[in-house]
Amino acid sequence: MMKRANSNRERKDAMFRITFIAACWVVIFSAVAQAQDEKIPVLEVRVEGIRIAKKGEVGVAVFNSRLGYPTHLEHAYETEWTGVEEGKEAVETVFDSLPAGEYAVSVLHDENGNRSLERSKLGFPKEGVGFSNDQKVKLSAPKFDKCKFHLSLGENKKIIVRLNYRED
């Protein structure tokens, strides 16, 4: 009878140890995951200067390389579209899953909803466009290197992009 009591006690002790170790691992993994989440940078893009009389969507594209910048959205690291509300001259978009690195932002006010930049016969934008670092369209769209900025671990960066419309 004594042997059986010891056996039960040993099982209880073993179960306690296993449960304790499992709980410790859960706490450790939770702390590591939380620490990693806190390091993820956040980029807030405020787009200003939307023409109130225009409808459509505002597309904010974040590029992490020169490839496709600024108009080939299929090469953007991440793109968010926001509907234009009547009477609003600004929209805000938050990107909270970007790794640290160099980025450049391009913005399109897609007035006709085709998610593509309409151009004149001379190649100039017919819809509102804007770029990070307040770069403007001159004879051509600004280059990635002129528009780029750095996003660091744990940083909460807010940038303002002002839309420019070509006067017809």
Residue positions per predicted region:
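Bacterial N-terminal signal peptides
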Residues: 19-30
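Sec/Tat signal peptide C-region and signal peptidase I cleavage site
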Residues: 31-35
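A short, amphipathic beta-strand motif
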Residues: 41-50, 60
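Extracellular beta-sheet/turn segments enriched in Thr/Pro/Gly and aliphatic residues
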Residues: 44, 128-167
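Short, flexible loop/turn segments at beta-strand junctions in immunoglobulin-like
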Residues: 49, 95-97
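Beta-strand signatures of extracellular beta-sandwich domains
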Residues: 59-63, 106
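A short tyrosine-centered beta-strand micro-motif
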Residues: 101-107
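Acidic, glycine-anchored loop motifs typical of Ca2+
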Residues: 111-118
